[in-house]
Amino acid sequence: MTVLETSYAENANQLGVLRNLRNLIIAVFLTIILGWTFGNQALAKTFELGVEHTEVLPSVSAELRPGAKFNLSAVEAEGQSNVWVKLPEWMCGTWKVGRETAVFRQDFKTGKIDKEPFTYFARHDFQYGMQKDREGGIWHYVGTPYHSKTSLSQFNEIHLVKSKEFRIADEQGVSFTTVMTVIRSNSVSQILETFQQESITSYTPAATPGSIEMTASTKSFDANGKPSRQSNNIATIKQASPFSEVDTYQGKDMKALFCEFLISTDQTNLLPDQAPVP
C-alpha cells in the first residue's frame, strides 16, 4: 500500500468514526426530545379539561398539627358520603403500578423548576369498579372522607382523603381531583409532620390491551395551606385482574349501599335483579 493509499484509508476510518459519533449524538438528542415531548403531551391531557390547581388550601386544624397526638376515631366521627360514579369498562379491575416518570418538578419555596424526566419505582395496586347495575354498567364507590395508613421504618403515614371529585368518566378518559391531608406520626401516635396535597389525575385507554395511561399532577401545601412543591408524573399501568363485584369493603355492605344510592338518585330502573329489600 502506498503512502497516499495509507493516508486515504486513515481518513476514511476517521470519517467513519465521526459519522458513528454523529449518529450516536443525534440518537441521544432525539431520545431526550421525544421523551420530553411525550411527557409534556401526556401531561397536557390532565389540563385539557380546564382544571387547574388551587392557589392555596385552608390551614389544618390544631389537632392535626405536629406535636399533637393523632386520634383517628375523632377524624372518623364524620360519616362517609354514599356517592357512586359510573366508570367505563376499560377502567374497571385491579391495576398494578410498577414505575412512574416525573416529567416536571417545581419547588415553590426556592422557585427551582426541573423538567428532566426521572423514572422511579412506585409499586402499589389499586382497584376501580365495585358493583354492576341491571344494564351491566359498572359503578365505583366514592365514600369520603376516608383514610389509608402505611407503616414505614421511621414513621407511620396516614392519608386523610377529604374529597374526591370525578370530572369526567367516559370512554375517552377518567379524570378526578383528590384533596388530602398527609400525617406522619411516630410509634406513640405523636404527629411529626403534616402537609396537604391536591392531585389531578387522568386515565386513558392505552394502545396495548390490558393497560391504561396515567397522567397526574400533585401539588403539596404546608399545614398553613401555602404551596410547597408540585410534581407532574406519567405512567403506563397494567391490569392485574379483571373486574369482579365487591360485596364487602372495609366492613361495609357495598351492594346495599349501591342500591340505596340508586334509590336516592331516582335510578331505580338500574337496581340489580337481586337488590336487597330496603
Language model: regions and residue ranges:
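Bacterial N-terminal signal peptides that target proteins for export
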Residues: 5-28
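C-terminal segment of classical bacterial N-terminal signal peptides
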Residues: 32-41
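Amphipathic/hydrophobic helical signal segments and adjacent flexible N-terminal regions
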Residues: 40-94, 98-134, 240-278
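Short, charged, low-hydrophobicity "junction" segments
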Residues: 65-74, 146-155, 183-189
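Hydrophobic small-molecule pocket/channel-lining residues, especially in calycin-type beta-barrels
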Residues: 106-173, 186
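A short, hydrophobic/aromatic-rich structural module that often spans a beta strand
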Residues: 145-161, 225-243, 264-272
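Short helix-loop boundary/capping segments
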Residues: 153-234
